[in-house]
Swiss-Prot record:
Disulfide bonds: none annotated. InterPro entries: F420-G6PD/mer, Luciferase-like_dom, Luciferase-like_sf. Belongs to the mer family. Phthiodiolone/phenolphthiodiolone dimycocerosates ketoreductase subfamily. Catalyzes the reduction of the keto moiety of phthiodiolone dimycocerosates (DIM B) and glycosylated phenolphthiodiolone dimycocerosates to form the intermediate compounds phthiotriol and glycosylated phenolphthiotriol dimycocerosates during phthiocerol dimycocerosates (DIM A) and glycosylated phenolphthiocerol dimycocerosates (PGL) biosynthesis. Keywords: Lipid biosynthesis, Lipid metabolism, Oxidoreductase. The keyword Lipid metabolism applies. GO terms for biological process: lipid metabolic process. This is Phthiodiolone/phenolphthiodiolone dimycocerosates ketoreductase. It comes from the Bacteria. Its EC number is 1.2.-.-.
Length: 381
């Protein structure tokens, strides 16, 4: 069984380097390593608490990134990256909030990027996170309902053929609205939905070109959710096999198991486990430090967490859970883990290089070659 494709995703954090240099360097690496796509995140501030964004926990990365919450705006950056884009690389946002921007603006931004890239833009979209909405006055009581309406609005505008359109909606009503940007050669950007709960999975089946969850932790969970997406697609009269099964996953690798285990023990890496719902923690006999019923990454507000709180939470992360949250191990072990996910339906993985946040500079550097070996192995799956 073959055909697995992969892409890279980066956070857009302001650094001491020229604004586009890190992203363009990553794009070049993606091209060399055979990636299909390059993605950027969409955050007003970081998901890593600023209280631990220091050299003690981030190592050399903290020297280059003095303010972890200084995030660039993604569509502006993607528009810049579109010029000089390698001929086959696709560009995407992973993922934009459905409610923080009016969906008409999102539809316009994605369609513009699609024209700039000659048909290689991807609109990744989800409900977003509380940290990027509620503190800024964006209503957060019904994020899934807002998402459904935003997605329906984007599709309605793209399908309007430049005619006036009116559409009732509790969140994004259209009254004689007009959307006249053309698709690129008859095709709009693909919509990749980050969905996890039952209602979001159904919306994915109705509207999306791909499903790209971020916090599914076990391959068996992935295959069950994928079946829900495909069932919803069938119910909507769509071809269920036309929806690309994707996922965002971190990779922690190194020269040997000791280096990998050390990286998995880092506080920054452990913080990713806070984004996993409480039920996954309970499976390992530990209550989520933010409550047994905590829903996960969408409800974290990291900028309010002080250092001691973060350290106390990190100390509670079960080692077995960390090994579910990310692909980890020697290159061969990581490739085997990805292959297991492929056997459960995964066909596209968007990778986060978690090895870069090891506090040890030496071990960050020595993880480069093992990481490259993983990527070479993925091309054979």
């Amino acid at each position: 069984m073959g055909g697995l494709r992969f892409g890279f995703v980066d956070a857009l954090v302001h650094s001491r380097l020229p604004p586009t240099l890190p992203a363009r360097s990553s794009m070049a690496a993606a091209t060399v390593m055979g990636a299909d796509s390059y993605w950027v995140g969409d955050h007003l501030n970081a998901l890593v608490p600023r209280s631990i964004a220091t050299s003690e926990y981030l190592g050399i990365a903290a020297k280059f990134v003095p303010k972890i919450d200084a995030n660039y705006e993604p569509w502006t950056m993607l528009g810049n990256l579109a010029f000089g884009l390698p001929s086959r690389l696709r560009l995407g946002v992973c993922v934009t909030d459905a409610g923080r921007r009016n969906p008409a603006v999102t539809a316009q931004a994605a369609a513009t990027l699609h024209l700039l890239t000659r048909g290689r833009a991807i609109l990744g979209i989800g409900v977003g996170e509380r940290e990027g909405n509620e503190p800024y006055g964006v209503e957060w009581t019904k994020p899934v309902a807002r998402f459904e309406e935003a997605l329906a609005t984007i599709r309605a505008l793209w399908n309007s053929n430049g005619e006036l359109i009116s559409r009732e909606s509790p969140y994004f009503p259209l009254h004689n609205a007009l959307f006249d940007l053309p698709p690129y050669r008859g095709k709009w950007p693909e919509i990749w939905v980050s969905a996890h709960g039952p209602r979001m999975l159904r919306a994915t089946g109705r509207y999306a070109d791909a499903w790209i969850p971020i916090v599914v932790v076990r391959p068996s969970d992935y295959s069950r959710a994928l079946e829900a997406v495909r069932s919803a697609a069938s119910d909507a009269g769509r071809d269920p096999m036309s929806i690309t099964p994707a996922a965002v996953r971190g990779i922690i690798t190194g020269r040997n198991r000791d280096d990998v285990e050390e990286a998995l023990e880092s506080v920054v890496v452990k913080m990713t486990a806070l984004g996993v719902p409480g039920e996954a923690w309970a499976r390992h006999g530990v209550e989520h430090p933010m409550g047994a019923d905590f829903s996960g990454v969408q409800d974290i507000i990291p900028q309010t967490m002080d250092k001691q709180t973060v350290l106390s939470y990190a100390a509670k992360v079960p080692a077995a859970l960390m090994k579910e949250v990310v692909f980890s191990g020697t290159p061969d072990e990581v490739i085997d883990q990805v292959a297991e996910w492929r056997d459960h339906g995964l066909r596209y993985v968007v990778l986060i290089n978690g090895s870069l946040v090891n506090p040890s500079l030496r071990k960050t550097v020595t993880a480069v070659l093992p990481h490259a070996k993983v990527l070479r192995g993925l091309k054979k799956l």
